[in-house]
Amino acid sequence: MLPSQSPAIFTVSRLNQTVRLLLEREMGQVWISGEISNFSQPSSGHWYFTLKDDNAQVRCAMFRNSNRRVTFRPQHGQQVLVRANITLYEPRGDYQIIVESMQPAGEGLLQQKYEQLKAQLTAEGLFEQKHKQALPSPAHCVGVITSKTGAALHDILHVLRRRDPGLPVIIYPTSVQGDDAPGQIVRAIALANARQECDVLIVGRGGGSLEDLWSFNDERVARAIFASQIPIVSAVGHETDVTIADFVADLRAPTPSAAAEIVSRNQQELLRQLQSGQQRLEMAMDYFLASRQRRFTQLFHRLQQQHPQLRLARQQTALERLRQRMRIAVESQLKRAEQRQKRTVQRLNHYNPQPRIHRAQSRIQQLEYRLAEIMRGRLSERRERFGNAVTHLEAVSPLATLARGYSVTSVSDGTVLKQTKQVKTGDLLTTRLKDGWVESEVKQIAPVKKTRARKPSPTKPAE
């Protein structure tokens, strides 16, 4: 059984990952010198090779985005100096380095020293902007620390004579290349500070290789420039050449000629500046006077506008405008009221009952006339019918029959006597005549014999 406090158990993947992270975090970026072997460049453009010495070797990879900055083609057996990151290729567990830059061994060692000194001085704060001194403007005397036979001195003097012929120049000749050069440059800077003859120094030389410019990467020169009480302009090599002196100097010029232009005054430019300043001053004065004149005119107009008579006139004008507005408003109100009245009258006329009453009365009169006509027609018709009925009634009336000589006899109970069997001898009868009544007593009842009517004889048809 495993003990209760057993160590952690790693998988292979986790082990490789942990080792890779330790290498990358603890080692960081390093400089390595060695001999190239097994160099290859597949279609991807990356470089793969082995870096070795007499006792060991290590696999290297340099990716395309890094190797495109290398200015030479690496060869088998070539001694190089590389700047690389140490890592582990996890899938195979191979320890390798990822190369960021590569240089031939000679220049590479110098570059390594350059980077180390740069990092050291950066950590000490020698490059910080707060230590930079401002250049005098204008400079009253210029000191030049360079070779008295070099092209740099010729270029500096040529520019100074062209731009500012009256500017004093003090030359502190010194060697700028070789083992003695750093010490001579340091002594020249100290001499210039001790004599205090100039208020700005140009320290530099012409272009060259890294070895040629190495005097200006010397720590002694860098510290002498930093300690100088006189502002220093570095002018080493060409624009692409950057030395430690450039970082520690108060100002870096890309070339010696540019340094001379920086510390000198261009008399023609000064004249143009004076003329431009005079023109700006005249324009400013003209503008000031014109603005004062405009201001005076504005104040004068304001005073005139504040005069009581003008204020009264403005108030009268405003009053007249108000009066006109009031008149227009009243007229407008009256017109609108009149229009509303007309519309109201029109609506009242439209709904007035008098015309309707007249129409109704006319209708009633027409109906009364028609009714009277109808009534007259009906009365005439009824009179005619009544007359006909009267005539007919008179024709069938018993009275009319009586008037023709007939009479009506009724028995005692009022029943009209129609047959003899209705009475007997001794009954009283009442007879109605045309002009009165006659009462009689039955004395005798004698029935009448019935006679049969003859049938008409048939007639012969005519022959």
UniProtKB/Swiss-Prot annotation:
Pfam families: Exonuc_VII_L, tRNA_anti_2. It is found in: Cytoplasm. GO terms for biological process: DNA catabolic process. Its EC number is 3.1.11.6. GO terms for cellular component: cytoplasm; exodeoxyribonuclease VII complex. Heterooligomer composed of large and small subunits. Belongs to the XseA family. Bidirectionally degrades single-stranded DNA into large acid-insoluble oligonucleotides, which are then degraded further into small acid-soluble oligonucleotides. This is Exodeoxyribonuclease 7 large subunit. The lineage of its organism: Bacteria, Pseudomonadati, Pseudomonadota, Gammaproteobacteria, Enterobacterales.
